[in-house]
């Protein structure tokens, strides 16, 4: 949706209804931003017939706290003057690739205006601010409970800094968010912190990481300087990141650390443009080390209902406790991973479940990796209902000889790996080995395999539980 072009006008009825923002800070704002979807929805979703949320556009449903009373109030308060016939819209379906995302950078003006404020669409009793220029972000963060970032261009060396959000604040990305070139390994384009905050996207938005400006086939292993982490989510508590469309990040996409009770849902990560070689990468894919979600030192985290096309780990948990990764679609990368573990400030992973997910055309399916010559602990890990296909290296891979430059072939036993369960893990290989387990002396224990069947590889290689791999 273009700035300033509301497809369907909204008529506030402030005296005749209940403000939907009383209990949920972003509900009213998203009805304003996603006006076309709201118009179609409200045409049939009436106050007198609010019985279910089937068919509700994903952005409206999530920003209205999944409560029909908020949806009803929003339709009453912000009801469209006219409405098109309703259409069915579902949440992100990981098994279907998204349409191609496109980005057009918007050049910054010499002087940025202050954010436009509106009390009509205020959430949580606060103010909604629409930001169209980078320079207005800091004042919006300081003064607004709801922030709409519309077609924002971040100049070189300029972070979209969302670290000081008000408690309960909501940030909505709209239009196309773009970034200038910043060849700096320590530069983070987006940083988010806060308590009870919601980070979400309006219908049709794109966050473009300008990856093509940096890709050289080496990622963080050398070559030119490039931002190592695109989005840093740290010290987020009881918060949500949802319904974001992100493409073309330089190296690692999400760096998630020191969070508690964080829900990440409905994310589309499309780095498919990095599959092709360029002049700097030779015959290799231009993008490298392009992890989707790196999770560290976090507790009670849920990552769900998301789609990833990249060139490295789809998800990598290197430390943390009580983490659920559910309903993921992973294409082209290195699979669903624990690790690498060892040699870091936090080397403990306990209580991680990967479930109901697909790993397609990737080098690995399910992987646990510990760094050679280091210490740590990996325990209570469960892979359940995982389907793999087109895997080129290992269907199930547990190895204790890992190094970023390549495995040593000689496992060490400083990292303990115990209570590991695989249930209903099935699929096919296009090359490589179905199962590869290389444990250090006495460092692996209590592995369980139930209804595990991966076929098509050139054989297996295991030294635990036995040399016949899955037999205890």
From Swiss-Prot:
Glycosylated residues are: 24, 300, 361, 385, 419
What name goes with this protein?
A: Probable endopolygalacturonase D
Cystines in this chain: 129-144, 314-330, 439-444, 462-469
**Organism source for this protein?**
Neosartorya fischeri (strain ATCC 1020 / DSM 3700 / CBS 544.65 / FGSC A1164 / JCM 1740 / NRRL 181 / WB 181) (Aspergillus fischerianus)
Alphabetically list the UniProt keywords. Answer: Cell wall biogenesis/degradation, Disulfide bond, Glycoprotein, Glycosidase, Hydrolase, Repeat, Secreted, Signal
Query: What is this protein's function?
Result: Involved in maceration and soft-rotting of plant tissue. Hydrolyzes the 1,4-alpha glycosidic bonds of de-esterified pectate in the smooth region of the plant cell wall.
Cite the EC number. Answer: 3.2.1.15
Q: Which GO terms describe its molecular function?
A: polygalacturonase activity
The region annotated as signal peptide is 1-16
Substrates-to-products reaction catalysed = (1,4-alpha-D-galacturonosyl)n+m + H2O = (1,4-alpha-D-galacturonosyl)n + (1,4-alpha-D-galacturonosyl)m
Q: What class of enzyme is it?
A: hydrolase
The lineage, from the top, is:
Eukaryota, Fungi, Dikarya, Ascomycota, Pezizomycotina
Kindly list the biological process annotations in GO that this record carries. Answer: cell wall organization; pectin catabolic process
The family line of this record is: Belongs to the glycosyl hydrolase 28 family.
Q: Which is a Pfam family this sequence falls into?
A: Glyco_hydro_28
The cellular location(s) given in this protein's UniProt record come to:
Secreted
Q: Does the keyword Secreted apply?
A: yes
Q: Which GO terms describe its cellular component?
A: extracellular region
The active site lies at: 312 (proton donor), 334
Domain of life, per the record? Answer: Eukaryota
PbH1 repeat intervals: 236-258, 259-297, 298-319, 349-370, 378-400, 412-433, 444-467
